[in-house]
């Protein structure tokens, strides 16, 4: 039976692949496809570009060149720079190519047309020129969105690539130390692109490099997942170089939530002056009044400055949140039209892609491109039910009665080709996790509401539900209240997920009943009047007498507030005997 089902599913998938390929051929092209929308968002986000070359000129070229006046030939080996691997589609005759000097005036003007600031650095000469150029490139590129490097900046041909490799290595280490960042590095060269790629891969082994698409280096190292090095041919002219840099940057960020993130950051940057105008220095006296009010209260005096800080941050956060919620650019990045275009983009990248739905614990059901698009845009109930009834059908849950009810009652997992449980766990963890060992920075954990700990003795997990006001100004041994939460396998029913330390994710089933409440006594830090964790064998721990609790992270405020509310509701339930006839009349 299972074998027949597998064979049937295989036939359905093969049929769907043919339909998907046909759909990509006959589909009507929308005014702006998903990649174009992503490129527009990326272009608005990019602010800074750095270009480094040994042959930079800072004056405008005297003459322009017309296509009809040019007879372009690919350089041969006699140039001493190797054979060019450029294709005819990469050549543009509107401007001189990069085999000549890099004209900063033209480069900066091309980026300026897109409201992007471009800085240039000319390689140093002299005995220590290489090292000085590496240091200067590193310093100027640390905060740049895009760095453009010439591969051949050295006087000695045998040393070609030393400056580029040295600067890139320092940037990669800087990004790893800072837990990663979005970074694109472009290298233009007259040498064979595969040769340069191999040289780069051999140089950066500690960062787990891999050659992708025969043109770029990506990294398996987790902190460098948003960094790539792209190698292009010097025959590319300046205008094409600018367009290529934005295009490659877009390939790194082209996604639904990543587009929304870029649009949100751009919106915040654009509103910087608006926020400074609103929170201007004239409000300083009013803020000091708030601090004085806290200091005047005996109950708040010891932590007045921390409370005032939280108040200020909440003000700023709410203001930014309000702006993002009404931002047309952010809304557009996740609009209905964008969601409609997204499946087309996935199929265009790989026509062999199969979309699947998994409803609850049932088998995966493959669906066509057009069916996915209709489900994403449907608003009418009967139309929705008709789409669900199409072949291949979703498995009907006997307790639900209809496929539409099954769709409503069970969790829905959308899949591209293979099982993507990890991606769903990641989004769940992002929703739930406020802090963990990876993103805590210099923060030393404090025991308070929302903190998740593991008791070493029995390996059980607990979340602190102590009221926040009872977690500060602690002077002596104090009871802290916890709720025991069950760690469950990632494939089992769960209510909360956080990023783990020894494992990628920790999934929990939180039962707010009173039977799971647990209490332990802790001594506070004498100076801070709070229970602070201490570092032991690379882990933060809290000690309650002989009991040791490992700090695993913290839930975000809405998450732990919801848990506390559920516990309170459970404790507030009232049970009493009543007249059965009257009780049953309630329904």
Regions found by a protein language model. Name each.
Residues 2-50, 54-146, 151-352, 469-587:
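Extended charged low-complexity segments that act as oligomerization/scaffolding linkers
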Residues 466:
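Phosphate-binding/switch region of NTP-binding enzymes
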